[in-house]
Amino acid sequence: MRTIALLIIIAVMLVPALAAEEEKIAITDEEGRNVTVPFNPSSIICLSPGAAEVIYALGESDRIIAVTDDCDMPPALLEKESIGKSSRNADLERIIELNPDLVIAKTGGLFPVEDEQKLTDYGIPVLRYRLLHINALIPMIEDLGRILGEEEDARDMANDISGYYDSILDRTGTMPDEDRPSVYFMSMGHFDWTGNRDSTGHVRIAEAGGKNIAADLQTKVPHVDMEWVIEEDPEVIVYSMTSEQYDGTTPTIEEMEAKRMEIISLPGFESIDAVKTGRVYITDIKMSSGLSEMAAMLYYAKWLHPDLFQDIDPRAVHGELLQKYLNMDIEDIYQVYPDAPVKSEG
């Protein structure tokens, strides 16, 4: 009898331990690392704006206990405790003090490896996502759905994004080079920074049906001479405006218009086809991360091929995504200039 009672006691004691073991989930993050994280974590610190946005969109923002200052979409996230300006300079001591179940950071050097090691030494798991393209956004949505127990909502969100994404690829996937306009992409708030074929900027241009004039340059983010740009004579110019270049959470039309005029007025640029035809566009760098990346892709497609995408209204899609997932009204939000309206019927 005593033996049976002892076995029952041991079994009861083991149940919580076994349950704890079951409350783990293996995730392959954007860097391809297999990380074991808690299932259904109650406390998350986000150093990745796109991840914070998707967690909010899944209705689970209460789990987020702190964010970096660049996690500002939607702005409601800024009500969380600030843990630093960005993942590169996050307050590690405070993170360790808060002892979250999970930290989600950016990829590569944007969150130093030694910083991650300090957290994992304290038993805090770290996932990494930067989400500069749809092919990173959709897997992360699915990952967060699994982690948070919101797989159905995550699947619906991923399907929404995939539907818009496929509507682009179906039209541009087999497009011959002669039908693709040449594009110069001004990266990260610099006139002379761009991206070669290994960059996400190149992928965005190619998938939208364009030709990146910097595709064959040697470095991933080459710094080029403006004379070279003039000689290449791109048909379209797209400039990525950084958050340091405007005052609010998103830029104003006036701020983007001023930047566009600055580009058009660069010495010698009056001879470039993109300037002569008015195909110079400004985007907010925040459009290249999170759910807004899908709207950015639609804008690119519409800018490069207005006739092919005349049935698509990128701003309307952007508004639908903001309203449906972030409870935001697009009315006063402008992250591209000029817009790409749908052609009127008749």
Task: List the model feature ranges, each with a label.
Residues 23-27, 34-36, 43, 113-193, ...:
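Extracytoplasmic substrate-binding proteins
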Residues 1-21:
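Secretory targeting signatures
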Residues 35-40, 75-82, 207-218:
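A local structural motif
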Residues 43-98, 102-110:
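A short, structured surface patch at a secondary-structure boundary
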Residues 91-99, 122, 224-233:
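Short helices/loops that flank or line small-molecule/ion binding pockets
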Residues 70-72, 194-220:
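Alpha-helical, coiled-coil/dimerization segments enriched in small aliphatic residues
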Residues 233-279:
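Flexible, solvent-exposed loop/hinge segments that line or gate ligand/substrate-binding clefts
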Residues 30-32, 81-93, 132, 217-226:
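Short helix-initiation/N-cap motifs at beta->coil->alpha
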